[in-house]
């Protein structure tokens, strides 16, 4: 374990100790909560306990709609135009309990949509608006999401009307689009297809800070974090750690937006476009604000931040503490943001709540009041707005947008679409009448199938040629795994479709063993070429399909070597992407720092290898049983990087046996660390001391962790051989098809 990983676990232990020391006993010494969720929990006692439970998230047990519910089918029944018309009416239907600024809810709905999608992180594909997670903690109570609860509550009558024909996840993004359109902006398009989840994501690492708005320096701003302070979407609008410095703020803006896959032009367009509308809220000190939604009283009914200042809403609203309105037409698209940014000199001032902001020096009173048509204000800006003028790179882009409003509008439309659709996945998932026709590079496009597909007889013939090619079972299975296991369940990127394993950057990743991959792919490409040259009726097979088919052939051979006759399911229809259709800079983030399924980890891994294994399994949407059976099977076949013998607890490598489990759980073997790093272990005969096996932390955790051991015992039992092969084939097929949304 690296020193960094050890510090990580020690910090968790200290946090838990502080928590336990802060508890108090009741006068009687009895538990004050007489139900199963009360009292000290396992993680209070063992804070470093492996989070196997993360693999159980979003199970059918938490879904009220049931396994038979088909969201795609329901969405297609939606009266899309009627819904949009209802949303248009909502924009100016101001409610007394939460009056609309400038008589238009549009700006706050733009913010709602932005903050739903804006949690996306390129590094691990998590976050974003694709699951409707803004409804749940922690996002529903982040300081940066103050009063967005009101936006969702305003939407509830419309969600109630259309029911399950549109998810909350889709509705929040669509509402942002409609808001922009009603304020005179032409959007790039909209695609539905986001399915709601029904409980908070527990797998997203938002940071280890224990206080809201804890500042992170650039030096400590580790991936995959996408915000500079705990509880913010991106950066502190007052500047880093509230320093009021636009220049230093620009560095943080550039870093955070890059982690969301946005370049400098997209960043400037998004900030300028978003701040064309609406205002911030800082009518008085934040001490007037009540608790956030998760901490609010029962009778608040899920609403938070109730204010005791004045009316608590309208002109008296307290949100971020800043009191800024950027443009003369805050409910209408314009170029006033950039015009004001460059027209005035700016002096630092304070909002009524005491937050750092900027006011136009000697500026005229031209900015409308949000609730009093008789009042006007001087132009105001945030520290982070001024970054677009005083950072030399941002300044050039901003001036171009100032001089060319059409270029600004086009850039904002495209950046907004990317922001709100980045985690929706490939175009095959897109639904609705407003899906743009243009194919965009960041969508990871693959060509459409333009030929008849192979049938079962063709697949059998291809597998026979693969097995006669001289490639080993390990090479076939390992290559297919390398191709398919790049999939990430968060943003639906990666997977075998496209055969991008043959392209940069994947072909050069150390985990993919470039020399071996090159050898295997050359052989498979020859087989593909021969088939396509000689096939009748115009049939063709893609290399992507051949890679998966070859892996299936390897699994079948491994099962045969263990005495089992199985047929691994196969669905043709993958196509091969080109290098021009592959954004290498974006795909580099899919390279695994660790892949426990191949017993691989980079030097200096930031977390223990078993933690990285759970993370990888969760990205692959695997359950704990699926994780367990895959590890056992892949160790038996031995797809370890560089052919390492760690975890290959068998004298029959290449056969799909349960030997990994039986030998790991064999009490005649005693395990000890092989070095100070505690990354590799030796298993010796308990009586003679003879070395029998070597294993990694990933291998040994299936005997150490109580949950994983319980699962390992199932497959180590004498009656489990058939079940093991059946379960392995099912889990293998799942991984091979993770990106086959066309099969749904």
From Swiss-Prot:
Which top EC class is named for this enzyme in its record?
A: oxidoreductase
Q: How is it modified after translation?
A: Formation of the three residue Trp-Tyr-Met cross-link is important for the catalase, but not the peroxidase activity of the enzyme.
Reactions mediated catalytically: H2O2 + AH2 = A + 2 H2O; 2 H2O2 = O2 + 2 H2O
Q: Which residues form the signal peptide?
A: 1-22
Entry GO MF terms = catalase activity; heme binding; metal ion binding
Keyword presence, Signal: yes
Q: Where is this site: Transition state stabilizer?
A: 111
The cofactor note reads: Binds 1 heme b (iron(II)-protoporphyrin IX) group per dimer.
Give the superkingdom in one word: Bacteria
Instruction: Provide a GO biological process annotation.
Output: hydrogen peroxide catabolic process
Give the sites of the cross-link named Tryptophyl-tyrosyl-methioninium (Tyr-Met) (with W-114): 234-260
The cross-references to InterPro entries, in alphabetical order and at most eight, read: Catalase_peroxidase, Haem_peroxidase, Haem_peroxidase_sf, Peroxidases_AS, Peroxidases_heam-ligand_BS
One cellular component term from this protein's GO annotations in UniProt? cytosol
Q: Where is the active site?
A: 115 (proton acceptor)
User: Cross-link named Tryptophyl-tyrosyl-methioninium (Trp-Tyr) (with M-260), where?
Assistant: 114-234
Q: Which Pfam families match?
A: peroxidase
Family, according to the entry, reads as follows: Belongs to the peroxidase family. Peroxidase/catalase subfamily.
Role according to the record:
Bifunctional enzyme with both catalase and broad-spectrum peroxidase activity.
* The protein's assembly and partners: Homodimer or homotetramer.
NCBIfam families documented for this protein: cat_per_HPI (TIGR00198), PRK15061.1 (NF011635)
Q: What name has this protein been given in UniProt?
A: Catalase-peroxidase
Organism per entry = Azorhizobium caulinodans (strain ATCC 43989 / DSM 5975 / JCM 20966 / LMG 6465 / NBRC 14845 / NCIMB 13405 / ORS 571)
């Amino acid at each position: 374990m690296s020193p960094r990983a050890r510090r990580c676990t020690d910090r968790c232990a200290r946090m838990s100790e502080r928590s336990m020391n802060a508890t108090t006993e009741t006068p009687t010494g009895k538990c004050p909560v007489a139900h199963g969720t009360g009292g000290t929990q396992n993680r209070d006692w063992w804070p470093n306990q492996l989070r196997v439970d993360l693999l159980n998230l979003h199970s059918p047990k938490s879904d009220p709609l049931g396994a038979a519910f088909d969201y795609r089918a329901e969405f297609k029944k939606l009266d899309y135009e009627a819904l949009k018309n209802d949303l248009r009416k909502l924009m100016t239907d101001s409610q007394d309990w939460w009056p609309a600024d400038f008589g238009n809810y549009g700006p706050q709905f733009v913010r709602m949509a932005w903050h739903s999608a804006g949690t996306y992180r390129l590094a691990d594909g998590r976050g974003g608006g694709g699951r409707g997670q803004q409804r749940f903690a922690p996002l529903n109570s982040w300081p940066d999401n103050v009063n967005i609860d009101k936006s969702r509550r305003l939407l509830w009558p419309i969600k109630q009307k259309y029911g399950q024909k549109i998810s909350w996840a889709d509705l929040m993004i669509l509402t942002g689009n409609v808001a922009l359109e009603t304020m005179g902006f032409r959007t790039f398009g909209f695609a539905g297809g986001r399915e709601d989840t029904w409980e908070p994501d527990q797998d997203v690492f938002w940071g280890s800070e224990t206080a809201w708005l804890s500042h992170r320096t650039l030096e400590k701003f580790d991936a995959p974090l996408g915000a500079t302070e705990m509880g913010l979407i991106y950066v502190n609008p007052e500047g880093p750690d509230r320093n009021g410095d636009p220049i230093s703020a620009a560095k943080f803006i550039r870093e955070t937006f890059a982690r969301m896959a946005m370049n400098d032009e997209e960043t400037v367009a998004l900030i300028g476009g978003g701040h064309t509308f609406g205002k911030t809220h800082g009518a008085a000190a934040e001490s007037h604000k009540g608790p956030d939604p998760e901490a609010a009283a029962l009778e608040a009914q899920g609403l938070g931040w109730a204010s005791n200042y004045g009316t608590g809403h309208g002109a008296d609203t307290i949100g971020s503490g800043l009191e800024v309105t950027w443009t003369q037409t805050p409910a209408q698209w314009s170029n006033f943001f950039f015009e004001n940014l460059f027209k005035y000199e700016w002096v630092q001032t304070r909002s009524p709540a005491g937050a750092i902001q900027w006011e136009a020096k000697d500026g005229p009173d031209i900015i409308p009041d949000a609730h009093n048509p008789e009042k006007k204000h001087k132009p105001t800006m945030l520290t982070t707005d001024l970054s677009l003028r005083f950072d030399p790179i941002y300044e050039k882009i901003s001036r171009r947008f100032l001089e060319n409003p059409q270029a600004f509008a086009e850039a904002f439309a495209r950046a907004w679409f990317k922001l709100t659709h980045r985690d929706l996945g490939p175009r095959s998932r897109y639904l609705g009448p407003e899906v743009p026709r243009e194919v965009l590079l960041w969508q990871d496009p693959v060509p459409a199938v333009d030929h008849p597909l192979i049938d079962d007889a063709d697949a059998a013939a291809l597998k026979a040629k693969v097995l006669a090619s001289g490639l080993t079972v390990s090479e076939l299975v390992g290559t297919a795994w390398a191709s398919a296991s790049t999939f990430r369940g968060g943003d639906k990127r990666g997977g075998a479709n496209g055969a991008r394993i043959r392209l940069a950057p994947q072909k050069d990743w150390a985990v993919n063993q470039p020399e071996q991959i090159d050898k295997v792919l050359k052989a498979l490409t020859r087989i593909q070429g021969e088939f396509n040259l000689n096939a009748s009726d115009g049939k063709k097979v893609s290399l992507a399909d051949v890679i998966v088919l070859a892996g299936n052939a390897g699994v079948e051979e491994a099962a045969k070597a263990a005495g089992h006759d199985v047929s691994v399911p196969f669905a043709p229809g993958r196509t091969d992407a080109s290098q021009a259709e592959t954004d290498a800079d974006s795909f580099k983030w899919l390279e695994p720092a660790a892949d426990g399924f191949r017993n691989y980890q980079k030097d200096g891994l930031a977390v223990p290898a078993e933690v990285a294994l759970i993370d990888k399994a969760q990205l692959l949407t695997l359950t704990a049983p699926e994780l367990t059976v895959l590890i056992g099977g892949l160790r038996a076949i031995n797809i370890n990087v560089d052919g390492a013998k760690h975890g290959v607890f068998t004298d029959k490598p290449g056969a799909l046996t349960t030997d990994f489990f039986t030998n790991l759980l064999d009490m005649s073997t005693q395990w000890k660390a092989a070095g100070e790093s505690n990354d590799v272990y030796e298993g010796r005969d308990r009586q003679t001391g003879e070395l029998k096996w070597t294993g990694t932390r990933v291998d040994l955790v299936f005997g150490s962790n109580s949950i994983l051991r319980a699962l390992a015992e199932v497959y180590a039992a004498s009656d489990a051989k058939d079940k093991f092969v059946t379960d392995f084939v099912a889990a293998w097929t799942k991984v091979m098809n993770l990106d086959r949304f066309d099969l749904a």
